[in-house]
Regions:
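Glycine-rich phosphate/pyrophosphate-handling loop used in enzymes and phosphotransfer proteins
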Residues: 1-170
C-alpha cells in the first residue's frame, strides 16, 4: 500500500500546506476536519439503506455475487465523482474512498495532520483477498480514479490493491 507509505504521506502533507484539504462534495476547505458539516444533511438524503448488497432485482449484477453502494449517484455524490474524474482532483477520489471505508466497513477515520486515515477494521472477515479497481481511462487525466478510491478501502479491510491483473479486450 504505497499510497500510505511514509514518503507519499509526507509529500501529501506538504501539498496540503500549500493547497488545503477540501470537501469532495462541495469543495469547501476542510483543513483538519474529518468531514464537512455543510454536506451532512445532503449526504444523509442520498444514503442507501444500511445493507452491503444491492438487490439483483433492481440492479444488473452479471456474474457478481453482490455489490455495494453507500449512496445513490445523484446531487452531491455525483458532483464529487465528476470532480474526481474531470476536474483534475485525484484527492476527491481518495476522500470518496475514505467515506466508502467508513460507511461500508465501519472503519473509524483518524486524522493524521490534514490526512484522513481509515483505521483497519478489527475482526473483519469477509473473505476478501484483494481490492481490484476496474481501470478508468486515465490517459488524459494522468491518474486512475478507481485506484485512488481503492487505497483507503484496502487500508480499512487490510488487503492489497491489485492493479496489474486485468486485460482490456475489444
Amino acid at each position: 500500500m504505497l499510497y500510505y507509505s511514509g514518503l507519499s504521506r509526507t509529500l501529501r502533507q506538504l501539498r496540503w500546506v500549500l493547497y488545503p484539504r477540501r470537501c469532495p462534495f462541495c469543495d469547501r476547505v476542510l483543513g483538519n476536519q474529518p468531514a464537512c458539516p455543510d454536506c451532512a444533511d445532503g449526504l444523509a438524503e442520498l444514503r442507501r439503506a444500511p445493507s452491503m448488497r444491492l438487490r439483483g432485482s433492481e440492479h444488473y449484477l452479471g456474474r457478481l455475487d453482490g455489490a455495494a453502494a453507500p449512496y445513490r449517484y445523484n446531487g452531491l455524490v455525483r458532483r464529487a465523482v465528476l470532480r474526481a474524474k474531470y476536474q483534475g482532483a485525484p484527492w476527491a477520489a481518495v476522500e470518496l474512498g475514505v467515506e466508502m471505508a467508513r460507511l461500508l466497513f465501519g472503519s473509524e477515520i483518524r486524522m493524521h495532520g490534514s490526512e484522513p486515515l481509515p483505521e483497519p477494521v478489527p475482526g473483519l472477515d469477509r473473505g476478501y483477498d484483494c481490492i481490484l479497481p476496474v481501470p478508468a481511462s486515465s490517459k488524459k487525466r494522468g491518474y486512475n480514479v478507481p485506484e485512488r478510491m481503492a487505497q483507503p478501502l484496502a487500508r480499512a479491510v487490510g488487503v492489497p490493491v491489485v492493479t496489474d491483473c486485468l486485460l482490456y479486450t475489444s
